[in-house]
């Protein structure tokens, strides 16, 4: 993390540039960034119907529910596919993490969007899918929620070039199933 940087808020491209430069391979870093950019561009071009559709990136932890706000690579990932962040979530202030906001079960309906990408963190997926408040969200009721876990959730969250390419390849078909092209 650069001096004065915020934990978990250094953009993926900046991370790759710093790492590649430190390893004496700045051109390799530029190439990897270009490959990710191209993968996003191709996926977005193949799904013009996603442009402007709203999304929420949500998570269930042992502490409860949360949603990612601007500054998170999880938000940027979806924006790179053409989606627009759910304005209700976008207007919320981040908590101490700087990149997410906590949500009570009573306010969980605020995650409703054209598509919801949700994943568990350090809890079984069943705690997410079995939560009655989550099941009551319209996007969930209408099968417009994509639940990810395991390697895909890790890749979606990690933000490295290799992880992002994997996540694009795995998540795009799931988004297609949820909301079409």
Language model features: what each stretch is:
Residues 61-65, 94:
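Short, catalytically relevant binding-site loops at active-site mouths
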Residues 96-104, 130:
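N-terminal post-signal-peptidase region of extra-cytosolic proteins
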Residues 1-62, 157-181:
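Extracytoplasmic substrate-binding proteins
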Residues 111-181:
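Structured C-terminal subdomain patch of bacterial secreted/periplasmic proteins
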Residues 69-99, 152:
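Alpha-helical, coiled-coil/dimerization segments enriched in small aliphatic residues
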């Amino acid at each position: 993390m650069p001096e004065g940087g915020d934990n978990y808020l250094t953009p993926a491209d900046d991370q790759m540039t710093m790492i590649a430069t430190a390893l004496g391979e700045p051109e390799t870093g530029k190439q990897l960034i270009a490959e990710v950019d191209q993968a996003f561009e191709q996926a977005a071009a193949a799904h013009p119907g996603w442009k402007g559709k709203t999304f929420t990136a949500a998570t269930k932890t042992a502490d409860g529910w949360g949603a990612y706000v601007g500054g998170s690579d999880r938000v940027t990932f979806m924006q790179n596919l053409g989606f627009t962040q759910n304005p209700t979530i976008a207007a919320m202030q981040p908590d101490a993490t700087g990149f997410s906001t906590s949500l009570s079960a009573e306010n969980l309906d605020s995650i409703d969007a054209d598509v919801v990408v949700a994943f568990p963190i350090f809890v079984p997926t069943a705690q997410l899918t079995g939560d009655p408040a989550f099941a009551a969200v319209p996007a969930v009721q209408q099968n417009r929620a994509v639940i990810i876990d395991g390697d895909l959730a890790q890749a979606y969250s990690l933000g490295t070039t290799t992880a992002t390419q994997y996540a694009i390849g795995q998540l795009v078909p799931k988004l297609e199933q949820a909301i079409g092209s």
